[in-house]
Amino acid sequence: MYRETMCAHYVGLSDEEINLLIAQLTGGRPVAEPESPEEYSQQEFDYPEPEDASTERRIDVYPKSGVPVIVPTFDTAVGVERLASGALERADLEWGYSSQWNPQPIFNTRIESADKPIWRASMEHDRCIIACRWFYESSGTETRISERTGRTIKQQYMFTIPRMPVIFICGIHRSHEYSMVTTRANASMAPVHPRMP
Protein backbone atom coordinates (compact mmCIF):
# COMPACT_ATOMS: atom_id res chain seq x y z
CA MET A 1 0.00 0.00 0.00
CA TYR A 2 1.31 3.45 -0.94
CA ARG A 3 1.57 5.79 2.04
CA GLU A 4 0.72 9.43 1.56
CA THR A 5 3.40 10.62 3.96
CA MET A 6 5.51 13.10 2.11
CA CYS A 7 8.46 15.39 2.22
CA ALA A 8 10.87 13.79 4.64
CA HIS A 9 13.93 15.56 3.20
CA TYR A 10 14.69 19.11 2.17
CA VAL A 11 17.72 21.37 1.83
CA GLY A 12 17.57 24.07 4.47
CA LEU A 13 19.32 27.37 4.99
CA SER A 14 22.01 28.38 7.48
CA ASP A 15 21.41 30.61 10.50
CA GLU A 16 23.03 33.50 8.61
CA GLU A 17 20.82 32.97 5.55
CA ILE A 18 17.68 32.85 7.72
CA ASN A 19 18.76 36.05 9.48
CA LEU A 20 19.26 37.73 6.08
CA LEU A 21 15.77 36.70 4.96
CA ILE A 22 14.21 37.97 8.20
CA ALA A 23 15.98 41.31 7.81
CA GLN A 24 14.68 41.65 4.26
CA LEU A 25 11.15 40.48 5.07
CA THR A 26 10.82 42.90 7.99
CA GLY A 27 12.28 45.90 6.19
CA GLY A 28 9.10 47.92 6.67
CA ARG A 29 7.49 46.96 3.36
CA PRO A 30 3.76 46.28 3.46
CA VAL A 31 2.78 42.65 3.17
CA ALA A 32 1.23 42.07 -0.25
CA GLU A 33 0.36 39.03 -2.29
CA PRO A 34 2.02 38.97 -5.73
CA GLU A 35 -0.17 39.11 -8.80
CA SER A 36 1.90 36.30 -10.31
CA PRO A 37 5.05 34.32 -9.43
CA GLU A 38 7.06 36.45 -11.89
CA GLU A 39 6.58 39.47 -9.62
CA TYR A 40 9.01 38.01 -7.10
CA SER A 41 12.57 37.74 -8.23
CA GLN A 42 15.98 37.01 -6.84
CA GLN A 43 16.67 40.75 -6.83
CA GLU A 44 13.57 41.55 -4.78
CA PHE A 45 14.82 39.39 -1.92
CA ASP A 46 18.48 40.17 -2.79
CA TYR A 47 19.28 36.59 -1.98
CA PRO A 48 22.11 34.62 -3.63
CA GLU A 49 20.98 31.86 -5.95
CA PRO A 50 23.12 28.71 -5.79
CA GLU A 51 25.40 28.36 -8.80
CA ASP A 52 25.33 24.58 -8.81
CA ALA A 53 23.02 22.46 -6.66
CA SER A 54 25.49 19.57 -6.59
CA THR A 55 28.47 21.55 -5.23
CA GLU A 56 26.79 24.05 -2.94
CA ARG A 57 27.32 23.63 0.81
CA ARG A 58 24.10 21.84 1.67
CA ILE A 59 22.12 21.61 4.86
CA ASP A 60 20.19 18.36 4.43
CA VAL A 61 17.20 18.26 6.75
CA TYR A 62 15.35 15.10 7.82
CA PRO A 63 12.76 14.43 10.56
CA LYS A 64 14.29 14.94 14.02
CA SER A 65 16.84 17.41 12.58
CA GLY A 66 17.31 20.63 14.51
CA VAL A 67 17.27 23.58 12.10
CA PRO A 68 16.42 27.29 12.01
CA VAL A 69 12.88 28.27 10.98
CA ILE A 70 11.19 31.69 10.84
CA VAL A 71 8.61 32.31 13.56
CA PRO A 72 6.37 35.34 14.06
CA THR A 73 6.62 37.18 17.36
CA PHE A 74 2.88 37.86 17.14
CA ASP A 75 -0.17 35.61 17.44
CA THR A 76 -0.80 34.37 13.90
CA ALA A 77 -4.55 34.21 14.60
CA VAL A 78 -4.51 38.01 14.92
CA GLY A 79 -1.84 38.89 12.36
CA VAL A 80 -0.22 42.26 11.66
CA GLU A 81 -0.71 44.87 8.94
CA ARG A 82 2.97 44.97 8.03
CA LEU A 83 6.08 43.02 8.91
CA ALA A 84 8.08 45.57 10.87
CA SER A 85 11.43 45.02 12.53
CA GLY A 86 11.05 42.44 15.29
CA ALA A 87 7.91 40.83 13.80
CA LEU A 88 9.84 37.69 12.81
CA GLU A 89 12.67 35.83 14.49
CA ARG A 90 14.80 32.77 13.96
CA ALA A 91 14.08 29.75 16.15
CA ASP A 92 16.08 26.54 16.22
CA LEU A 93 13.44 23.80 16.24
CA GLU A 94 13.32 20.04 15.71
CA TRP A 95 11.40 18.74 12.69
CA GLY A 96 8.49 16.62 13.90
CA TYR A 97 5.90 16.76 16.66
CA SER A 98 6.24 14.18 19.39
CA SER A 99 3.16 12.40 20.69
CA GLN A 100 2.35 9.84 23.36
CA TRP A 101 0.73 7.48 20.85
CA ASN A 102 3.42 7.46 18.15
CA PRO A 103 7.14 6.81 18.81
CA GLN A 104 8.08 8.43 15.48
CA PRO A 105 7.96 12.20 14.98
CA ILE A 106 4.93 13.49 13.07
CA PHE A 107 6.65 15.75 10.56
CA ASN A 108 3.78 16.59 8.17
CA THR A 109 0.43 18.19 9.00
CA ARG A 110 -2.35 17.62 6.49
CA ILE A 111 -4.24 20.89 6.04
CA GLU A 112 -7.44 18.82 5.93
CA SER A 113 -6.67 17.63 9.50
CA ALA A 114 -5.79 21.02 10.96
CA ASP A 115 -8.74 20.92 13.37
CA LYS A 116 -7.49 17.77 15.14
CA PRO A 117 -6.38 18.36 18.74
CA ILE A 118 -2.68 17.79 18.05
CA TRP A 119 -2.63 20.58 15.42
CA ARG A 120 -5.46 22.95 16.34
CA ALA A 121 -3.70 25.45 18.64
CA SER A 122 -0.53 25.56 16.54
CA MET A 123 -2.47 26.03 13.30
CA GLU A 124 -4.37 28.95 14.77
CA HIS A 125 -1.75 30.71 16.88
CA ASP A 126 1.72 29.40 16.00
CA ARG A 127 2.35 29.22 12.29
CA CYS A 128 5.91 29.48 11.00
CA ILE A 129 7.89 29.67 7.77
CA ILE A 130 10.18 26.87 6.67
CA ALA A 131 12.71 28.38 4.26
CA CYS A 132 14.51 25.95 1.98
CA ARG A 133 16.37 25.72 -1.31
CA TRP A 134 14.38 22.69 -2.52
CA PHE A 135 12.69 19.55 -1.25
CA TYR A 136 12.76 15.94 -2.33
CA GLU A 137 9.96 13.49 -2.86
CA SER A 138 10.02 9.76 -3.54
CA SER A 139 8.02 8.36 -6.41
CA GLY A 140 5.24 6.00 -5.45
CA THR A 141 5.95 3.71 -8.40
CA GLU A 142 9.44 4.35 -9.85
CA THR A 143 12.57 2.73 -8.46
CA ARG A 144 16.29 2.78 -9.17
CA ILE A 145 19.44 1.03 -7.96
CA SER A 146 21.29 2.88 -5.20
CA GLU A 147 24.86 3.75 -6.21
CA ARG A 148 25.91 3.46 -2.57
CA THR A 149 24.28 0.17 -1.51
CA GLY A 150 23.33 -1.54 -4.77
CA ARG A 151 19.79 -2.03 -3.45
CA THR A 152 16.57 -1.05 -5.15
CA ILE A 153 15.24 2.24 -3.78
CA LYS A 154 12.42 4.62 -4.69
CA GLN A 155 13.30 7.22 -7.31
CA GLN A 156 13.81 10.64 -5.70
CA TYR A 157 12.72 13.88 -7.36
CA MET A 158 13.93 17.34 -6.43
CA PHE A 159 11.34 20.15 -6.44
CA THR A 160 12.22 23.82 -6.85
CA ILE A 161 10.46 26.96 -8.02
CA PRO A 162 11.93 28.43 -11.23
CA ARG A 163 13.87 31.68 -10.71
CA MET A 164 13.37 31.46 -6.93
CA PRO A 165 16.49 30.69 -4.86
CA VAL A 166 14.40 30.16 -1.72
CA ILE A 167 11.07 28.38 -1.19
CA PHE A 168 8.84 29.45 1.70
CA ILE A 169 6.82 26.52 3.08
CA CYS A 170 4.02 26.82 5.61
CA GLY A 171 4.71 25.22 8.95
CA ILE A 172 3.38 25.16 12.49
CA HIS A 173 5.32 24.97 15.73
CA ARG A 174 5.06 24.37 19.44
CA SER A 175 7.71 24.39 22.12
CA HIS A 176 10.89 23.11 20.40
CA GLU A 177 9.17 21.31 17.47
CA TYR A 178 7.74 22.14 14.04
CA SER A 179 5.73 20.36 11.36
CA MET A 180 5.36 21.03 7.63
CA VAL A 181 1.81 21.74 6.40
CA THR A 182 0.80 19.72 3.33
CA THR A 183 -2.10 19.79 0.90
CA ARG A 184 -3.25 17.94 -2.22
CA ALA A 185 -0.70 18.01 -5.03
CA ASN A 186 -1.02 20.44 -7.92
CA ALA A 187 -0.53 19.41 -11.56
CA SER A 188 3.28 19.72 -11.36
CA MET A 189 3.60 17.52 -8.28
CA ALA A 190 0.81 14.98 -8.84
CA PRO A 191 2.73 12.71 -11.26
CA VAL A 192 5.23 12.02 -8.45
CA HIS A 193 3.19 12.27 -5.23
CA PRO A 194 -0.45 12.99 -4.23
CA ARG A 195 0.60 15.57 -1.56
CA MET A 196 2.75 18.70 -1.53
CA PRO A 197 3.87 21.39 0.97
Regions found by a protein language model. Give the residues of each.
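Short linear sequence motif anchored by a di-proline
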Residues: 1-197
